Amino acid sequence: MEEGFRDRAAFIRGAKDIAKEVKKHATKKVVKGLDRVQDEYSRRSYSRFEEEDDDDDFPAPADGYYRGEGAQDEEEGGASSDATEGHDEDDEIYEGEYQGIPRAESGGKGERMADGAPLAGVRGGLGDGEGPPGGRGEAQRRKEREELAQQYEAILRECGHGRFQWTLYFVLGLALMADGVEVFVVGFVLPSAEKDMCLSDSNKGMLGLIVYLGMMVGAFLWGGLADRLGRRQCLLISLSVNSVFAFFSSFVQGYGTFLFCRLLSGVGIGGSIPIVFSYFSEFLAQEKRGEHLSWLCMFWMIGGVYAAAMAWAIIPHYGWSFQMGSAYQFHSWRVFVLVCAFPSVFAIGALTTQPESPRFFLENGKHDEAWMVLKQVHDTNMRAKGHPERVFSVTHIKTIHQEDELIEIQSDTGAWYQRWGVRALSLGGQVWGNFLSCFGPEYRRITLMMMGVWFTMSFSYYGLTVWFPDMIRHLQAVDYAARTKVFPGERVEHVTFNFTLENQIHRGGQYFNDKFIGLRLKSVSFEDSLFEECYFEDVTSSNTFFRNCTFINTVFYNTDLFEYKFVNSRLVNSTFLHNKEGCPLDVTGTGEGAYMVYFVSFLGTLAVLPGNIVSALLMDKIGRLRMLAGSSVMSCVSCFFLSFGNSESAMIALLCLFGGVSIASWNALDVLTVELYPSDKRTTAFGFLNALCKLAAVLGISIFTSFVGITKAAPILFASAALALGSSLALKLPETRGQVLQ
C-alpha cells in the first residue's frame, strides 16, 4: 500500500514537471520570435536563450529530474502543499519587465551599449578595476565624463523627443512662471499696501529690494544644493518655501512680518531659474536643446502677464475685503498676493509626478535609477508615437567613479540634532567645494567672463525696466503740475464746502465762518491764508498742505489733517477733536497711477513675445554667441532712442522696443550657461551667476532711479556702456552649438 502511494506521488510530480517544461519551451519560443522581429530596432542579443537551449537539449537523469539531488528532497517530495501547486519557480519573466539592470558580465558576447559599441569588459562604474581611487588623475575623470556625455546623448536620441519632454516642459514652465510673478508682486501692491501698513518712502524702497535680496540668496543656496541632493528634490523644497511664505504674507498685518515673509518667499523662488533650466536640459538631445530651452523662457513672460492681469482685475475691487475691528484688515491687494502664489502651488503638485534627472543619477553613481528613468522617457514617447512594441535597447550606462566624500553617522551616535549638524556641515562643505571648483584652472576663465556678461546684462536690463515706469510717473507728475489751477486773494464768507478740491493752489485767501464738511482734498495747497471761525468735519486729504496759514477759533472734527500738514502755520484757540485713525503719513492710494503701473507692466512683458519666438527658432541655426551678441548690440542701439522719449506714450513704446530686442540675449545666456558647465557643477554655477544677476539688478535700480527728474543722459550712457561691454565679452566665450551636454 505504501509503495503504491509513493509510485502514485512520483507519477503526479513527474507529470507536473513535464507540463512545466512544455510551458517554458512554448513561452520561450514565442518571446524569441517576437524579439527577433524587433531585432532591427533594438539590436538585442539572444545569448541567454542559446545558453538555456544548450542545457535543455540534455535533460537530467530520471532520478535527479523527478526526485531531486538528495535524500532530503526525496523524503519531502510527497508532502508538497497545495498552496504551492501551480507555482512555477522557473517561469520565464517577460522580456520588457525591469529585472535589475543587466551588467556587462551577464550580457554575454552580444551585449552592446547605447551607441552600439561592445562593452569590452566594462564592469560597474567607469574605471572600476583600474587601480585605487587615489591613483586616478583629473585627466582620467575628464575622459570618463566625455564618454558618459557621448553615450548619454546617444541614449536621448534613442528615447526621442515627444510626450515626456512636453509634459515636463509645462510642469517646469509653471515653476518659471512663479519666478516671473514674484518679481512683480511687490511693485503692484505698494500703491495699496502703503496705506494699510503706513509705509514711508524708505520702507517702500526696502520692500522693493528685499525680494531681490531673497532671490539672490535662494539662487546660490538652491543651485548649490541641487548638484548634491538632486534637481527635483531641491526644486520641490524651494517652491514649497515660496508658496508657504507667500501665503503667510497675504495675512500678516505688520510691516516687519510682511517684509520677513516676502524675504523668505524670495529665497524660495530664487532656486527656480537655475534648477529649471538645468533640469530640463538634461532631458533634451543636442538638436532640440537650444530651441526648447528658449521656448521654456516664454513662461517667465507669461508670469509677468498673469501678475499684471490679476492686479488689474483684483486690486481695484475694494468690496473684496473685510476687517475685524481696527487691528485686522484684509483688503483686495491681499487677495492678489494670495492668487500670485497659485503658479508655485500648481508647480509643486505637477512636479511630484515627474522623475529625477537621470543625468544627476549617473553623476552620483546611481546606474539602476538612471536606467529606469530613461526607460520611462523612451516608453512614454514610443507609446505616444504609436510604437509601443519598441523596446528600450540600452542595457548598460557608464557612471562616474565616486569619491568617498560622505560622512556616515550611526543612528546611535549622539543626539539627533548632533547627527543632523554633522550632516549639514558635511553637505555645506561639499557645496562650497563644488562652488570653488568653478574657479579652478579649467573653468576660471569661463566663470569670470560669464560673471561679466551676467552682471552687465542684469545691470542694464533691470535698471532700465524699473527706470521706465518711474520716468512715466515723472512725466505724469509734470503734466499734472502743468494743469494746476491757482486762486489768488479770494475772500469767502459763510460758505459750506462739501465737494472735492483737486490740483489747486489757494494763495492769500481769507475764509470767515466757513464750513468744510465731507470735503475731499487731493493735491491742494493753501498758502498765506487766514481761517477764522471755521469748522472742518469729516475731511480727507492726500498731498494737501497748509503753508504759512493762520487758524483762529477753528474746530477740526474727525479729520486726517495731521500736524505735519501744517507747515509754518499758527493755530490760535483752535481745537482738534476725534482725529481719524490710521496711517498718519500722506499716501496717494490707488487710482489712475496704479492702473498705469499695471498697464505698462502688462505691455512691457507682452512685448517680449516676438523676441521669444525669434530666439527659439534661430537659437540652433545661428548659434548662442551670435544671438547673445546681436541682441545686446540691438539693445544698446535702442537705448539711444530714449533721448526722444519726452511723452508718456513715447516712453511706453520705447519700453516695449527695449524688452522685445533684449529678451533674445537672455534666452541665449540661459542656454549658454547650461551648456558651458558639466553636470556636477551646472546648477551651482547657474545659481551663483543668477545670484550675481540679482545683485546687479539692485545696483542698477538704485543708480538709474536716482536720476529720475534730473537727467536722462546718465541712464542712457550707463545702459549703453554696460550692454556694449557685455556683448564684447560674450564674443570671447566658446560656442556650444552642436556640442553634447557635458
UniProtKB/Swiss-Prot annotation:
CDD domains: MFS_SV2A. Residues 32-49 have a biased composition (Basic and acidic residues). It is found in: Presynapse; Cytoplasmic vesicle, Secretory vesicle, Synaptic vesicle membrane. Residues 1-169, 227-233, 284-294, 356-447, 620-626, 673-685, 732-742 are cytoplasmic. InterPro entries: LD_SV2, MFS, MFS_dom, MFS_sugar_transport-like, MFS_trans_sf, Sugar_transporter_CS, SV2. Plays a role in the control of regulated secretion in neural and endocrine cells, enhancing selectively low-frequency neurotransmission. Positively regulates vesicle fusion by maintaining the readily releasable pool of secretory vesicles. This is Synaptic vesicle glycoprotein 2A. It comes from Bos taurus.
